[in-house]
Amino acid sequence: LAVVGIWAAKKDDRAGAEPEEIIPVEHLVLPEEEKTEKKRIALTFDDGPSENTPEILAILKKHNVKATFFVTGKEGEEADEWYREIVADGHTLGMHSYSHKYSVLYDSLDSFQDDFTKLSQKLEDVTGEKCWVYRFPGGSSNQVSNTDMNEFIDYLGEQGMTYYDWNVVCGDATSQIYTADELVQNVMADVVKYKNSVVLMHDAAEKDS
């Protein structure tokens, strides 16, 4: 597994520098008085948990890195344990819809609300923690929704949620097969372009690079 991590490097640091400061995703948007010249990079994983989750968590722990896991609804005690481990290790647990089925999720505001409530309640029941961050499947500007995405965005705001898209991808969601080193190279080639980067990766059984 290729893990870049969430880190803040000095403005003049080059790609490949050692992590200097670990930050959670919620600190990407800072109060004006806390803004610095450092680059900030948030590592995020979508679609989990999966059988790869324990290995991802082990690697993150080894390197003292915190990440955000935007999870879907998975059933069974094994999945419940993975949810709990994400929280126990100090990572941010975010929502990525229960079903991840675009045709159902984005059919109407009612459908979206039902899906949201189902996942929100499940995660709170399993972990004891209330989620406050959300990532839309396909992103907030996807073209597959039958409903104006602004309706969903407004609803999340009413629930006290913040949604996050991404501006850097590692390439693990494409048809092309990349090695772990190539995934890292893809990320490092893009993070140098931004002061604040949100890196999209996936925690899925079929993605084991």
Outline where the language-model segments fall.
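Terminal accessory/targeting
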Residues: L1-I41, A58-A67, D181, V192-S209
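Active-site beta->alpha N-cap acidic-glycine motif
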Residues: E18-F136
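Catalytic domains of cell-wall/extracellular-matrix polysaccharide-remodeling enzymes
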Residues: E55, E77, H100-S209
